[in-house]
From Swiss-Prot:
<dbReference type="GO" id="GO:0005525">
    <property type="term" value="F:GTP binding"/>
</dbReference>
<feature type="propeptide" description="Removed in mature form">
    <location>
        <begin position="203"/>
        <end position="205"/>
    </location>
</feature>
<dbReference type="GO" id="GO:0005856">
    <property type="term" value="C:cytoskeleton"/>
</dbReference>
<dbReference type="GO" id="GO:0019953">
    <property type="term" value="P:sexual reproduction"/>
</dbReference>
<feature type="lipid moiety-binding region" description="S-geranylgeranyl cysteine">
    <location>
        <position position="202"/>
    </location>
</feature>
<dbReference type="InterPro" id="IPR001806">
    <property type="entry name" value="Small_GTPase"/>
</dbReference>
<comment type="similarity">
    <text>Belongs to the small GTPase superfamily. Rho family.</text>
</comment>
<dbReference type="InterPro" id="IPR003578">
    <property type="entry name" value="Small_GTPase_Rho"/>
</dbReference>
<keyword id="KW-0449">Lipoprotein</keyword>
<dbReference type="GO" id="GO:0007165">
    <property type="term" value="P:signal transduction"/>
</dbReference>
<dbReference type="GO" id="GO:0031410">
    <property type="term" value="C:cytoplasmic vesicle"/>
</dbReference>
<dbReference type="GO" id="GO:0007015">
    <property type="term" value="P:actin filament organization"/>
</dbReference>
<dbReference type="GO" id="GO:0030865">
    <property type="term" value="P:cortical cytoskeleton organization"/>
</dbReference>
<dbReference type="Pfam" id="PF00071">
    <property type="entry name" value="Ras"/>
</dbReference>
<dbReference type="GO" id="GO:0005886">
    <property type="term" value="C:plasma membrane"/>
</dbReference>
<feature type="modified residue" description="Cysteine methyl ester">
    <location>
        <position position="202"/>
    </location>
</feature>
<dbReference type="GO" id="GO:0042995">
    <property type="term" value="C:cell projection"/>
</dbReference>
């Protein structure tokens, strides 16, 4: 029997320090291109939207939420399969140092969350063809992802669109894997025969 993917609402929460590009990442993905050509001179805002996408030739709805600690606490329906993007900018060591803070806030609400650590603004990593000083390297991102028990470390740039779609494709894959796993477990639980507690033992007369 083919599953009805139209009923799935994939929830992706985007967190991180101010200025790391959370709204830009959401806008770039929903628009399907780099922001340099699509949103020149416009002010980008994003809070909580639902968008329709096609993933692996299946129509899906995504709820994309940008939030802080208070926003997370207000959202009552956070589920086991929801995905959290902890974002930091590779040109901001301060935002990198605050990753642990965001990880802690998420785990206060959900002890075993699905986290992808995302390094943004990778187009700013090099200046004049040379690696900038005091920049967060890919190796540092990978190591930090291991420290916070993230599922994966990924990087992107909304100026070039590099890696943006891949971040959300991976988020959807994680969500769907967990969602279908839970559904299959529930189905199997109905198939397990229940023990007959009313069965009487045979007694010798």
């Amino acid at each position: 029997m083919e599953r009805n993917f139209n009923n799935f609402l994939v929830k992706i929460f985007c967190l991180g320090d101010d200025g790391v590009g959370k709204s830009c990442v959401m806008n770039s993905y929903s628009s399907g291109g780099p922001l340099t050509s699509l949103f020149q001179g416009s002010e980008l805002t994003w809070t909580d939207y639902t968008v329709s996408v096609t993933h692996n030739q299946k129509p899906l709805k995504l709820r994309l939420v940008i939030g802080d600690q208070n926003e997370l606490r207000r959202i009552k329906q956070i589920e086991f399969n929801d995905v959290f993007l902890i974002c930091f900018s590779v040109d901001s060591k301060a935002s990198y140092d605050n990753i642990e803070k965001w990880n802690t806030e998420i785990r206060k609400i959900l002890p075993t969350p699905n986290i992808i650590l995302v390094g943004t603004k990778i187009d700013l990593r090099k200046e004049g063809g040379e690696l900038k000083k005091s920049i967060v390297t890919q190796e540092m991102g990978i190591e930090k992802a291991k420290e916070i028990n993230a599922i994966k470390y990924m990087e992107c740039s909304t100026a070039t669109y590099e890696g943006v779609k891949e971040v959300f494709d991976e988020s959807i894959n994680i969500y769907m894997t967990k969602k279908l796993y839970i559904q299959d477990l529930r189905k199997k639980s109905f198939l397990i025969p229940k023990k007959n507690t009313n069965k009487k033992s045979c007694k010798t007369q």
